[in-house]
Amino acid sequence: MDLYPEENTQSEQSHNSENNMQIFKSENSDGFSSDLMISNDQLKNISKTQLTLEKEKIFKMPNVLSQVMKKAFSRKNEILYCVSTKELSVDIHDATGKVYLPLITKEEINKRLSSLKPEVRRTMSMVHLGAVKILLKAQFRNGIDTPIKIALIDDRINSRKDCLLGAAKGNLAYGKFMFTVYPKFGISLNTQRLNQTLSLIHDFENKNLMNKGDKVMTITYIVGYALTNSHHSIDYQSNATIELEDVFQEIGNVQQSEFCTIQNDECNWAIDIAQNKALLGAKTKSQIGNSLQIGNSASSSNTENELARVSQNIDLLKNKLKEICGE
């Protein structure tokens, strides 16, 4: 079934009706974004658990009536798999944990749905959140001690303890830091605060490194999600809730959802995840903080040990560079 209407598309949209696939691209001075959307018909090799209720086992009915009822209540499972990629530079003034970045928005979803045929579009009712990969990259030289704390929260949830989807702490002394979160739940497209479902909060601790107006780092993120006509359409892979890329394990640690096991003992830190933060780029206003403590209260000795470890790693890196350069 061809899900997309036959009409002229904009230059930023690549349309392949034969493969039921669309690619959206946009790039300007503010950053780059790219989105892929592919229909379920092209992903038949993905196994799914069927949720069925056989009406003929509930009601006694003639064979002919049974066939008519079965046909009348049959339902096609519409699924559109989407991958959204965005990159933006962050002002150091906006990297203080006082604003949030929405990783998926109602406007973005409506843009995807607008490209579908009306008979398919009006059946879509759910968005399933599969995975979020986040990469932070410094816009300054390597070797500067620059701790960074990040939290991904569902800001629709009032409890600050329960809203946490995942949190990570790292250091941009090595230039970049990357981690992945697997939300693995579905929400209605009509939920009131859809834009707050995936809210990224970032706190750059070295606040005196630059002045307001200077771009301190780049945030690149990828969100994998699916648009469907049912809450029962999707099965998720059994990944951990949150994970650090292997290469960054030595310079960071993570906090998973409460029922998960923390795999790193160095997890004594906190980040402000107060509700009603301003949107990234908007004017901020003063508000009462609400810090979520990760692990036990951090002691000064733990902080000193962490800084010493980072300093030692930087020294090792410097020595390696000297060996490579033959100094």
From Swiss-Prot:
Q: Where in the cell is it found?
A: Host cell junction, Host plasmodesma
Function statement? Transports viral genome to neighboring plant cells directly through plasmosdesmata, without any budding. The movement protein allows efficient cell to cell propagation, by bypassing the host cell wall barrier. Acts by forming tubules structures that increase the size exclusion limit (SEL) of plasmodesmata, thereby allowing viral ribonucleocapsids to spread directly to neighboring cells.
User: What name is this protein filed under?
Assistant: Movement protein
Question: What GO cellular-component annotations does this UniProt entry give?
Answer: host cell plasmodesma
Q: What is the lineage of its organism?
A: Viruses, Riboviria, Pararnavirae, Artverviricota, Revtraviricetes
Residue ranges of coiled coil: 297-327
Q: Quaternary state and partners of this protein?
A: Homotrimer, through the coiled-coil domain. Interacts with VAP. May interact (via N-terminus) with host prenylated Rab acceptor protein 1D (PRA1D).
Family in the record: Belongs to the caulimoviridae movement protein family.
Q: Name one GO biological process term.
A: transport of virus in host, cell to cell
Q: Which Pfam families does the UniProt record give?
A: MP
